[in-house]
Swiss-Prot record:
The record's free-text note on cofactor binding: Binds 2 calcium ions per subunit. Binds 1 heme b (iron(II)-protoporphyrin IX) group per subunit.
Domain of life from the UniProt record: Eukaryota
Name listed for the protein in its UniProt record: Peroxidase
SUPFAM superfamilies named among the record's database cross-references: Heme-dependent peroxidases
GO biological process: cellular response to oxidative stress; hydrogen peroxide catabolic process; response to reactive oxygen species
Pfam families: peroxidase, Peroxidase_ext
Bilayer-spanning residue ranges: none
Sequence positions bearing Pyrrolidone carboxylic acid: 21
Length: 364
C-alpha cells in the first residue's frame, strides 16, 4: 500500500533505532522448513534468498564490487520519488518499489545508472527464481551485502512491497557534478534533511568509482573500501594535493594521496555551511556513523510505502564482523592537513597513523 511520505517518518526512525543487533535467524517463534528460526512465517523465503545471494551474487559472502553496485542501486531506485512532481499533477515516482529492475529498459538509460546492467539482470533472476518482489529484493540484497563488510550496521529489512510499479521519472537522482544546493533541494523534496544527506553518504565508505575516470577504474573513495568506517569523512576533509590519474575525470577533485578518488559533490558537502558540522561529527565515531546511517536507510527503504503494512524480517539479516580499529589521519599527514569547515565546533582529536603517505590499489 502506497502512502504519503511524511506520515510515516516518525515511525521509521523509532523502528530503526529499535533494531536488534544479534545474528540473523535467531530468537523467532517460527521454525522455517530449513530449520531456521524467525519472527514470522513470511520471512522464511528470505533464508533461501540469503543463501543464493551469498553464494552466487556475493561470490562467497565477499565485500567487493557487487556490494558497491547494490549500494548504488538501492539509492537510485528509492530516490525516484518526488512529492513536488505529485503536487504538480505529475507522476512522482514510486520510491523503493524495484522499478529500476522492473523497468530497466527505461531506467538504465538514465545517465546516473550507467554500468549497472549486469547487476540488475542478476538481481532480476534471483527475484524471479524465489518469487519475491524486486523492491523487497533490492532492500534485502543491500542489507545482506553490507553484512559482508566489517563494521557495517545491521540494516532493517521489511518485506511486503508489491511488484507493481511504473518507471521512475527522469532526472531525480542527484549526482557528483551537482551543486550542494541542487543536491539538498532534490533530497529535501524526497523528505531528507541536510543532516540525513550527510548520514546517507556513509555508503561512500565502501565506494569506488568506475565511470567517472576510466583511467583509474575502481579507485576507492577512502583508504578502507572494504570496511564501513569513518575514514571516508576524515579523508574527504584532507587538502587535495594529488591528481591520481593522468587527468581529472568528470566531477573529480584533487585527492590527498595516490589512488584515492574524490567526488566533487563529496568535497563540497564536506565544506558547505549547511552540512560541514554534521560531516565533521561523523569523523570520530564508527558507532555514531553506523547508527545514523541505519536510521537514514530505514527511512529511505520505505519511500512511497506505509511501513506499518510491511512485515519486519530483520532477523534474517546476518551481523557484520565488528571493526575495532579507531579512526585515524592517514600516515604522512597531520591534523594541519584537515580543512576544518565547521566554525562552531573544534575538530575532534583523532590519532595520526604512523608510516608514509598511503598509495591505494583499486578496490576489488
Amino acid at each position: 500500500m502506497k502512502l504519503s511520505l511524511f506520515s510515516t517518518f516518525a515511525a521509521v526512525i523509532i523502528g530503526a533505532l529499535a533494531l536488534p543487533q544479534g545474528p540473523g535467524g535467531g530468537g523467532g517463534s517460527v521454525t522455517c522448513p530449513g530449520g531456521q528460526s524467525t519472527s514470522n512465517s513470511q520471512c522464511c523465503v528470505w533464508f533461501d534468498v540469503l543463501d543464493d545471494l551469498q553464494t552466487n551474487f556475493y561470490q562467497g559472502s565477499k565485500c567487493e564490487s557487487p556490494v558497491r553496485k547494490i549500494l548504488r542501486i538501492v539509492f537510485h531506485d528509492a530516490i525516484g520519488f518526488s512529492p513536488a512532481l505529485t503536487a504538480a499533477g505529475q507522476f512522482g515516482g514510486g520510491g523503493a518499489d524495484g522499478s529500476i529492475i522492473a523497468h530497466s529498459n527505461i531506467e538504465l538509460a538514465f545517465p546516473a545508472n550507467g554500468g549497472l546492467t549486469d547487476t540488475i539482470e542478476a538481481l532480476r533472476a534471483v527475484g524471479i527464481n524465489h518469487g519475491v518482489s524486486f523492491g523487497d529484493l533490492i532492500q534485502f540484497a543491500t542489507a545482506v551485502g553490507m553484512s559482508n563488510c566489517p563494521g557495517s550496521p545491521r540494516l532493517e529489512f521489511l518485506t511486503g512491497r508489491s511488484n507493481s510499479s511504473q518507471p521512475s521519472p527522469p532526472s531525480l537522482i542527484p549526482g557528483p557534478g551537482n551543486t550542494v544546493t541542487a543536491i539538498l533541494d532534490r533530497m529535501g523534496d524526497a523528505g531528507f534533511s541536510p543532516d540525513e544527506v550527510v548520514d546517507l553518504l556513509a555508503a561512500h565508505s565502501l565506494a569506488s568509482q568506475e565511470g567517472l575516470n576510466s583511467a583509474i577504474f575502481r579507485s576507492p573513495l577512502d583508504s578502507t573500501p572494504q570496511v564501513f568506517d569513518t575514514q571516508f569523512y576524515i579523508e574527504t576533509l584532507l587538502k587535495g594535493t594529488t591528481q591520481p590519474g593522468p587527468s581529472l575525470g568528470f566531477a573529480e577533485e584533487l585527492s590527498p594521496f595516490p589512488g584515492e578518488f574524490r567526488m566533487r559533490s563529496d568535497a563540497l558537502l564536506a565544506r558547505d555551511s549547511r552540512t560541514a558540522c554534521r560531516w565533521q561529527s561523523m569523523t570520530s565515531s564508527n558507532e555514531v556513523m553506523g547508527q545514523r546511517y541505519r536510521a537514514a536507510m530505514a527511512k529511505m527503504s520505505v519511500l512511497g510505502f506505509d511501513r506499518n503494512a510491511l512485515t519486519d524480517c530483520s532477523d534474517v539479516i546476518p551481523s557484520a564482523v565488528s571493526n575495532n580499529a579507531a579512526p585515524v589521519i592517514p600516515g604522512g599527514l597531520t591534523v594541519d592537513d584537515i580543512e576544518v569547515s565547521c566554525p562552531s565546533e573544534p575538530f575532534p582529536e583523532i590519532a595520526t597513523a604512523s608510516g608514509p603517505l598511503p598509495s591505494l590499489a583499486p578496490a576489488p
